[in-house]
Amino acid sequence: MPRPSPQQLEQLEGLRAVVLAEMMTLGLLKEGDHERLHHVPLGVLRSNATQRHGVTRWSGDGHGNLKVDVVDLNPHLLTGTWHDYAAFVLFHEYLHVLGHRAHDQTFRALESRWPNARASARGKAFTHARRLARASWHWVCPTCEERYPRQRKGSGRYMCRRCKTVLKDVPSRDIE
């Protein structure tokens, strides 16, 4: 796993402070939780990650108990454009650290308490931005002009989700 740069560590610590303060305000932290979350190591994912925005990594102690190793965030979340969404992703991962491992109804109810609804809804936009940044090809529908950014050629094997027309491969450098 990549190690965060000193600048990334500084940004992660700033995010931690923001998220922990908000969790205190929301009344989500029991006694000892603040200290526990404050000591969870923070890191970054590989820079080529497009689907994963954050992850809580666990290890077993040999007795069936789990211990948090690290909470990793996508390094592209640490840019100014995505700061609000980065705080939400860290909040999401902290809910996992507090014992809510599944994305069940209880987890979603806790997650919905994050005060910035706009930030929490930016996940699809972040994934799309990362896919665009990494795309070498666009699969383009000649009928409806829908575009699908991809890293590999489709070679005529895929159809448009909208109109079921075979998609054409267009190099990213040819896309305006």
Regions inferred by a protein language model and the residue ranges of each:
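Active-site-proximal or metal-binding-adjacent scaffold patches in catalytic folds
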Residues: 1-88, 97-176
